[in-house]
């Protein structure tokens, strides 16, 4: 197998291990989306299987002696010479170096956004827990107990009352 074909097969194999198919399937809502998703997965598996089997194998060496017996040796020698002179060009990747810095910068930005999102999620979860706690105790809670948890609100109400601005 040529170096480029083997590299493609290796990349596809690694990609198949890192794809969270079950996680993506859980996100789908409609039946049509599930059908399309299963078609995508089946197509990916077929292509990946082909890459792993068909393109990852080395070609069998040609038995030139066998052909010399059945065909004239001169013709076989010319074919062998032509076969040996064939050079398969190596793929030189010119695109990846161009986009790698941009991709790395996006990864850094992604990590920062992820951290920010996790902090915001944590804050919101705490806020939800507080609201749930208050909603459970609301029917039996006194104003003093509520103001104990929220002193800034008590100060605001006291200022309004002091200024004869009763809730307006």
From Swiss-Prot:
Superkingdom per UniProt: Eukaryota
One of the Pfam families matching this protein, by short name: Mt_ATP-synt_D
Cellular component terms (Gene Ontology): chloroplast; chloroplast thylakoid membrane; cytosol; cytosolic ribosome; mitochondrial inner membrane; mitochondrion; nucleolus; plant-type vacuole
Keyword Ion transport listed: yes
Chief location: mitochondrion
GO biological process: proton motive force-driven ATP synthesis
Record's function text: Mitochondrial membrane ATP synthase (F(1)F(0) ATP synthase or Complex V) produces ATP from ADP in the presence of a proton gradient across the membrane which is generated by electron transport complexes of the respiratory chain. F-type ATPases consist of two structural domains, F(1) - containing the extramembraneous catalytic core, and F(0) - containing the membrane proton channel, linked together by a central stalk and a peripheral stalk. During catalysis, ATP synthesis in the catalytic domain of F(1) is coupled via a rotary mechanism of the central stalk subunits to proton translocation.
Assembly notes: F-type ATPases have 2 components, CF(1) - the catalytic core - and CF(0) - the membrane proton channel. CF(0) seems to have nine subunits: a, b, c, d, e, f, g, F6 and 8 (or A6L).
Family affiliation: Belongs to the ATPase d subunit family.
Protein name listed in UniProt: ATP synthase subunit d, mitochondrial
């Amino acid at each position: 197998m040529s170096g480029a074909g083997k590299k493609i097969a290796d990349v596809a194999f690694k990609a198949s291990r890192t794809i969270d198919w079950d996680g993506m399937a859980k996100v789908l809502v409609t039946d049509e989306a599930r059908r399309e998703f299963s078609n995508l997965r089946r197509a990916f598996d077929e292509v990946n299987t082909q890459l792993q089997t068909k393109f990852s194998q080395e070609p069998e060496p040609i038995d030139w002696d066998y052909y010399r017996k059945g065909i004239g040796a001169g013709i076989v020698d010319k074919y062998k010479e032509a076969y040996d002179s064939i050079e398969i060009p190596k793929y030189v990747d010119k695109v990846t170096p161009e986009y790698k810095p941009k991709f790395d910068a996006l990864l850094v930005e992604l990590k920062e956004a992820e951290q920010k999102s996790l902090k915001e999620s944590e804050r919101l979860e705490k806020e939800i827990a507080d609201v749930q706690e208050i909603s459970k105790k609301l029917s039996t809670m006194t104003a003093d107990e509520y103001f104990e948890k929220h002193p800034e609100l008590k100060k605001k109400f006291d200022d309004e009352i002091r200024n004869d601005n009763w809730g307006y």
